[in-house]
Amino acid sequence: MGTPRQFYQILKAQQHSYVPEEIVKLFAQIDAKRLELLAVNLAKYISTNLPLAINRRDGLEDYRTNPYVLMTCANVMKLHKPEDFAKFLFDSKFYMGLETSFGKSMEAAFVSAYPVKSGDGEKWIDPPEKVAEAAALEGLANEEKALKRTSSVWREIDKSVVLNGRRYLTSIKSGPNCINDTQVQAMTAAIVGNHKGWMRHSQETYKQVKELDIVVGITYGTDRTSNNKENQILVKLLGHGFVEEDREKKPGVLIDEETRSIRVYRRIGKEFWAFIGDPVQPDSAGYIFLEILLALAKGLSKGLGEASLETRINLKMASLAAALSKMMLPMGSLPEWVRKEFSESELFWFATAMTAFYDEGI
């Protein structure tokens, strides 16, 4: 079978170099009608949900951040004025918000348009079993929901599709560095503990299912640029009911040793979107990542125009700057040695970071 080190080398071996001629060929395969539909749906989503993401943050307490990193950034970036500080805080939190929950929602909107060769009833969907799990939590207190979620069977699975007697389950990760050690352990434990149950439930829900593929998907990046955490999941599965299916013909693909009907592998960047576009023959769908990017560009231009975001953003930053100004310490109330040792900018940075230790602060 080889050692884990050799396994990592195999997973990292594939190189993805930018070749303009290849991109031109991929452009020729894009479906203009599907792209337009994706763009329209995305524009609707953005015009409705992006303003909500902006409006969600009101006071300083909605901009919580690390006070130590904050003071360092403020010094390096020379953020001397409340207005500059407000823009920095807003921009950083806005980006983080888009990269997490809002970004994940947009990814879901894209995924549901595929696979390309499927019928109307064969698109990527939320697993019905996961939907049922969530429905069972309705009406429970938050504490009860938290307890129930610890025993969730489908928590790690985001999307599902059935094609040609095989069910594909995918756990979608936003980027090549977003999986941490805790998530590695959670995903590994979920697969080890639930893969037989996932197969059983799949065959109960879809009578035609004979095989199951469990795929860790990363929406951008390459095999060589990831932080290796997705590969650690695969390595940890070796010896826990899974073996390599065929190192030469199917590098990086694991299969359950007992029934040899359940596979686990990961797909990154272009290969992830090719898998989403055609799980059965992903090599024929290498253009899907371009289709997604073009739809995003078109959808953003439409959606942002309809949402009138510029005024909202400016109002939020002005409100945040005013709140930061109120946090300034009165110079006359400070000890003389403090007034001598620290500049007005340094005291502003200090006062802003200090609010992180209070309910009303950042």
Model-predicted segments: where are they?
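Interdomain/boundary linker segments immediately adjacent to catalytic/signaling cores
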Residues: 2-110
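Polar/charged alpha-helical tracts
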Residues: 9, 21, 25-28, 48, ...
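Short, flexible coil/linker elements and helix-boundary hinge sites characteristic
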Residues: 15-17, 114, 139, 207, ...
